[in-house]
Amino acid sequence: FGFKVGAAPFHLAIPDAYSGTSSMVAGVLATASKAMGFVALMRLLLTIAMPATGPAFWYGALAVISVVTMTWGNLAALSSDNPKRVLAYSSVAHAGYMLAAVSAIGSGLADGPASEMIVVAVLFHLCVLVLFKMGPFMVLSAIEREGGSHRVAGLNGLASGDPLMAASMF
């Protein structure tokens, strides 16, 4: 599941996969694939691998993976000049945020209602991520069709030239 959700150290292929394909295909990879992976991972960890009492054996490792994933995703995005790679690293960082929440459930410190709220928060985050990740990929797809650049610098002037398209990047 680490590769499917984009968790470090399994995330290394994600920036190459997003930047090496069309923006619409990358948008599907960034949304549908990640959503299905997270739902399956949460189902496995919280239904099958969760003990009746006390912490789960996997929560410590998942907590460390989530911290590394958050940090790596954000730092790597800073050095990229390809918008699809920036979005890929953003997906990696968001995977870390959601993994941190899942590891909080596994710690055993959250009681029943708190665990349920964490699950709802992760699912909400996942839904928002899916909705707001498609916008930038659609904009990049439109720019590609018009023969635009594959660099962040190619987005200069987008807000003055097409404000609606620029707003869709957020």
Enumerate the predicted regions with their spans.
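Alpha-helical transmembrane segments of multi-pass membrane proteins predominantly involved
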Residues: 1-170
